[in-house]
Amino acid sequence: MDKIVIKGGQALHGEVQASGAKNAALPILASALLADGTSTYRNVPALADVATMLKVLRTMGCDAERDSETTDVCRVGVNGHITPEAPYDLVKTMRASVLVLGPLVARFGRARVSMPGGCAIGARPIDQHLKGLKALGADIHLTEGYVEATAKQLKGGTVNFDVITVTGTENVMMAAVLAKGRTLMENCAREPEVEELAKVLNKMGARIEGAGTSSITIEGVDGLKPVEHAILPDRIEAGTLLVAAAISGGDVLVKRVVPEHMDALVEKLREAGCTITTEGSGLRCKAPQRLDAVNITTTEHPGFPTDMQAQLMALMSVSQGTSVISENIFENRFMHVPELHRLGADITIQGPTAVVKGVKGLSGAPVMATDLRASASLILAGLRAEGRTDVSRVYHLDRGYERLERKLSALGADIRREKA
């Protein structure tokens, strides 16, 4: 098992490139099930979660591989001989594995998918996925920890999500593209990754309108064809790199991003005192030695993303003043707070709200990552802390960040990966 070792105090400078978006790559890889033939995807990040999705697809009979360990190209080949089952030993490690459910029942008429696992952040149920598939005519049973869905032919219908769900929107959208007739989806997630999936499906021959808004209309088609597509940049990784510049008092250009996808974060960084400029398809963050406290409320896109909450908390822990951070998306998403306390942060949790009183400095200490974004938060805090910080259980980090320690090192951080 690896750990990340950081010696803090170095201001970051230079240029770094964002990798492809994990949260776009996973549903797009699953969408390959909707067509016979080989789909080719570029700019696919080398992440543990991507490797898990490829393994899920191989388990079902697909030819799903990365071209090599050093390339960003993945290919998924599908023929008619698919075993439509995603087993527990894989799905338990990554809840996004449930994204194969919609494509399987739409294309092959049946699916058996284990109930999902992944990060230990609240309940994150899949009831809205199942509600949507039922509205399209699927017969669904929960048996021995598995979702079993069958349908001779899905039929278009109206799906009104009770709560906004990104993976639920994606799963039902993938099912509806092969349903007979028109499907209207309401209260949909508006994340860029949903819009990206719709773009890929339309390239395959689907007829989707409205993705990126709360109302999506889909005209079902008889079949789809394989596709070639480059995955959009990861706005959360890019945001984490901008916060790394901010917390270190540095000057960093994050290249190959989509600036408009990051408006909510950029607004908060500017409010805190950073200078953020757009340079082509990149964002530059130049930060003073100490920033001002800002309040943060996580909401669905286009609001402030929950996946950046832990990173901003690390930044606020060394800002001037008091910050109030309200988490409205997931319960139990303050698990990084006790570890930040170990570094000297002054944070009080009051239900879904954290009150962060900025301190002048942090001190290095051994800490433990509890989930994906918490691991990034602790690394960011370690960049600012005086002395040595050891972050253990970084397998969480590898689920969603492509060689983050190498990117930070190239910007001047004293950071390395070691065997724990």
UniProtKB/Swiss-Prot annotation:
One of its GO terms (molecular function) is UDP-N-acetylglucosamine 1-carboxyvinyltransferase activity. Keywords: Cell cycle, Cell division, Cell shape, Cell wall biogenesis/degradation, Cytoplasm, Peptidoglycan synthesis, Pyruvate, Transferase. It catalyses: phosphoenolpyruvate + UDP-N-acetyl-alpha-D-glucosamine = UDP-N-acetyl-3-O-(1-carboxyvinyl)-alpha-D-glucosamine + phosphate. The keyword Cell division applies. InterPro entries: Enolpyruvate_Tfrase_dom, Enolpyruvate_Tfrase_sf, MurA_subfamily, RNA3'P_cycl/enolpyr_Trfase_a/b, UDP_GlcNAc_COvinyl_MurA. It comes from the Bacteria. Pathway: Cell wall biogenesis; peptidoglycan biosynthesis. GO terms for cellular component: cytoplasm. It is an enzyme of class 2 (transferase). Phosphoenolpyruvate binds at residues 22-23. The modification 2-(S-cysteinyl)pyruvic acid O-phosphothioketal is found at residue 119. One of its GO terms (biological process) is peptidoglycan biosynthetic process. UDP-N-acetyl-alpha-D-glucosamine binds at residues 95, 124-128, 307, 329. It is found in: Cytoplasm. Its main location: cytoplasm. The keyword Cell wall biogenesis/degradation applies. Its EC number is 2.5.1.7. Belongs to the EPSP synthase family. MurA subfamily. Cell wall formation. Adds enolpyruvyl to UDP-N-acetylglucosamine. PANTHER family: UDP-N-ACETYLGLUCOSAMINE 1-CARBOXYVINYLTRANSFERASE. This is UDP-N-acetylglucosamine 1-carboxyvinyltransferase. It comes from Myxococcus xanthus (strain DK1622). The lineage of its organism: Bacteria, Pseudomonadati, Myxococcota, Myxococcia, Myxococcales.
